[in-house]
Every structure is written in structure tokens, then in C-alpha cells.
Amino acid sequence: MTITIKSDNVTTGGTLGNVNGLKDQDYTLLLDFQNGEYTKKVGGVITNLTEADVLTCTSNKTLATKPMTMDRLGNKLYITKTDQTRWWQVKNAFGDFFGLLIESEQVNWFLNSATPITQTISNIPAGSTMVASCIGTGSITITGEGINPVTVTQDTPATITPQSLSTTISLTVTVTGTLSHVQVVRCAGFAGVHSPITTTTSRPTSGFDKVEINQALIAPLLAGTQQLTILIQSVPLQHTKDDRSQYNETRVVLETTALVAGLGLNKAANTNIGSRIVSTYKSDGSSHVSSGTVAISAQLNAPVTQVFSVGDFGFKGSVNGGNVYAVANATGLNNVTRIRLAEGVAAPSVMQGGNCVITKLAVFKKQLSDQEIKEFSKSWL
């Protein structure tokens, strides 16, 4: 007699013998935010960890703006502490994602956002590119001098790019139908929807998310490490079409005794993406290196897996299985003491902080060949 066993479950991103989706199992630290599973591997021994073991949160969110977090069932909850870790679920054409929510500080320029009525927004600073979004069954129509009129619904947020960027901006936002929230936010990094920022008759800043891998965890794991590779997957809440020629966001910030380096993602108006690195000297804040590329074809709102490899060879990166981008003079990133998640890097080598959901992250204490880097960056896709 022959017995056939069938399963209704379909595995993605790996085989049954490789259920975590990694292209290489020789990792030191694996943080699967999607499934809430965290492990370290020392001497071949795997140890399970908790969220408290792996993350340190020093966020400074403004509770008056009613910042939200989300559970794995998609339920939205208001946070109760300014330094609370936030989570978010994203469902789009590419899948169902869940992970750590990181957003930079923003202002919602639309007043009384939870009881929206038609209004004019004045004195938006020059040089602003904005994203308008709303929640509900109605819509908003945005008009103003120097912009192309646009109508926005819950499913169709839009980028607003003033034709003249040298003067302050005024917008008229006309509300139609039933809406529970309206938002007009200036872009920081990529053009995309920010989680809801509630306003009243004033518009306080949202505050920022600031999360890093627990230093007490990585200190013994990375002590004396000369070659380090970080693998990370991120997905946006919802990007909108953006005609700016090129822009960027961090995904990881590495810190050594001498340097702070932002490793992130470049994006172009044609939606091409690529690796980026900027780093500064801690002693005087001067630039160490600033370099990037946008050579990889990508689709708007698709998940992105990136490999960042640093060592005596400098920096090497790959995105979604694309060609390796190398920066030979980006040396000195040995003996990493901190790994911060999607935090901004200040002048002179600026990289905007990330606005994204980080679903997975893995750390490897070894140098990879170019072919391995390309293969690693196909993980979880």
C-alpha cells in the first residue's frame, strides 16, 4: 500500500530544510520580526532569544499625535509610552508582511485630521515634496498654485511636487464624502504614506522611532570581528510615485570607535534601486565616504532584500540578487560596536532615516565572495 501525504501549507522563501529562507545557515544572529522568532548561533549551538534580548528602543514619539502600532492580526492600537517599539502589517500585491516599524519625525500639515473639513494649508516650506493620504470612503482633492491638481482616496495616496520649489507653498484640500483621517506630510527620504499622525488645532511633530540591536547582545557576539555581513529585508507602508531624480533612506547604521556609517537604499524616479553608503568620522563629523548606485530594476512597493558586507576590502552591497556594488575606500568599519536600525545620518554625508517595516535581519561574521553576496540578497524573496 502506498500512502501519499499532502499539505495545504506552502512554504515560501526556503525549502523544508531551510525554513528561515536564508541562502546560508552559518549566521551569528537571526531576527525574524515577521514571525517573532529570534536566535543566536555560537559554536554551532542555536539559542532562542526574546524581543527584550535583541532590541533596545529609545524612541521619542509624541503621544498627542496618537501614534499607532499593529498586531499580527492587523488590529491597530495606540501606543502608551513615548519609547514603545512599534510594529506594522503591510498587505499589498507582493504579499503579507509584518515587522518592526521605523519612521522619521514628521508633521501632518492638515489640521483637525480626525474630523476633516475643507481647508487651506499655508506657508509650507519651500523645497517640499509631499504625500497626501486619507482613511475612509470619501476623497480629498488638492489644488494650489504651482501644483497639478490631484484627487486622493484611501487606496490612491499621491505625491505632490510643486512646480516651483523656491517659494513657500499653499494648498487647498477639499474634502468630499466620509473620511476619518486626512494627512499631508512632507517627504523625508522616499515618497510614501506615513502611519497616521493626528492633529487638532495645532500640528505637533510626530516624534521619531529609534531602535537598535541590544549592545549587550552584540558586544560578545561581534568582539574582534574583522569581516561583517548584514542581511536585511524591508517593505514600505505604501510608496507613491515620485519624480525626483534620486533619493535615499538608511536601513542599518553601523558604529565603530571611529566611524558612523549609514548603509541604505537608493531609489530613482524610474523606480530603479541600489545600494548606498555614507559615513562620517566621529572625531570631527567630517565625511569619510559617500557613494551609491541605482542600477537594479524594481517595482514600486515590492519588498527589498539587501546585503551589506564590510571589512578590510571596504564595502560591498547587493539588492534583490543584483550585481555587487563595491566601494573600496570605505574601510575602517571593523569591530562594530552598535547596529542601529534605519536611523538617519547627519551632514556632511546625509542619508535620510528609514520609513519602512523591517521584516527580517541576519548577521554573519564572515567575508563573502561577490557571488555569495548576490545569492544572499535573494533571501526571503
List where the protein language model places each region.
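Short strand-turn-strand beta-turns centered on an Asx-Gly dipeptide
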Residues: 143-145, 318-323
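Short, aromatic/His-centered strand-loop micro-motif at the edge of beta-sheets
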Residues: 147-152, 158, 279-305
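Extracellular carbohydrate recognition and processing domains
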Residues: 144-170
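Flexible glycan-contacting loops in extracellular carbohydrate-active proteins
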Residues: 168, 326-358
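A carbohydrate-recognition surface predominantly in extracellular/luminal proteins
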Residues: 128-134, 219-239, 245-250, 302, ...
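Short tryptophan-centered beta-strand motifs in secreted/extracellular beta-sheet-rich domains
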Residues: 301-317
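Glycan-recognition/cleft segments
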Residues: 250-278
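Extracellular polysaccharide-targeting segments
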Residues: 2-117, 174-225, 359-381
